[in-house]
């Protein structure tokens, strides 16, 4: 008996505290009924020393996802890689297939999550991670609950959203008062004056196309007429679209990046958002890059819990909201830095194209657009 006890003690001495705590978190262990305290999880996270994150490109979002967390938890280094949404899936799936487990958390758009990461079994349910002080209390979240894009409400958590302005226009050349419907863009006077973000790839062009395709007052007929309009231009480069609009070459831009649009406006260029309530058919809301997933076999299981708790805290959400200029779904996060027209109103009903129902229609919509453009 004494020999068995000595062998157990020797093995235990070889197990790091972080690994031991992770083992205790596994279902089916003897202590599964008595989970560790938050203080114990933070201590284990500090011993892990790192959390690895993939997030959107851009210096402001990089700072929002790293600096405040590093200041609060200097013992936990954030290794963040900025990537475009269409790069994330191939990278992660290839790594997991090779049993390379290097990433903990991904902050990205719902299209990347729903079309690639979830079906590729690259991610795990989020709710077991939400055990910190900022994620247990749901009373400050819109509607008193967390929002997920996937139907099981397990894998892709949305933490911010914004109302998509119908389009951006040069206020020196275009009067907003003449627009009452999306169909007003079909007026011949706008021929040769419109850019539409490439609708065949993720972004504002496909987002608007999703709205048009699914709206009973617009539909395929409107899309055919708009997409075959004389001299409509469909760039892939958001900056080029905004530069065209600012210089007046194409004074109406449908679907450019709202983050870049806000940067152009802040520089004093004559660009404005068309108010979402201007057009009778309305517009839509989207999460943009404001959603997260937890990667399967994450290498830092405790650090990722601490990181997610901070990101979803009032402080973490304020940093994100300031960087993107979009509203957090937390009601206790200030919105004075966000354009009022981009803030979803609690008494309004919006078509939320971040949800799985709409994301699953994207391939059908893309094929329809291709058929129209090929004629």
Model-derived segments and their meaning:
Residues 6-19:
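Short, low-complexity, charge-dense intrinsically disordered segments
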Residues 34, 345-375:
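Conserved C-terminal helix/tail region of periplasmic/extracytoplasmic solute-binding proteins
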Residues 35-46, 52-77:
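Short, polar/charged alpha-helical segment
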Residues 55-67, 79-93, 101-242, 246-247:
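Extracytoplasmic ligand-binding site segments that recognize negatively charged/polar headgroups
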Residues 112-116, 252-272:
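A ligand-binding cleft/hinge motif common to bilobed small-molecule-binding domains
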Residues 166-173, 210-214, 287-300, 319-320:
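A bilobed periplasmic-binding-protein/Venus flytrap-type ligand-binding module shared by bacterial periplasmic
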Residues 223-228, 232-235, 268-296:
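Periplasmic-binding protein-like
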Residues 290-353:
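Mature extracytoplasmic/periplasmic domains
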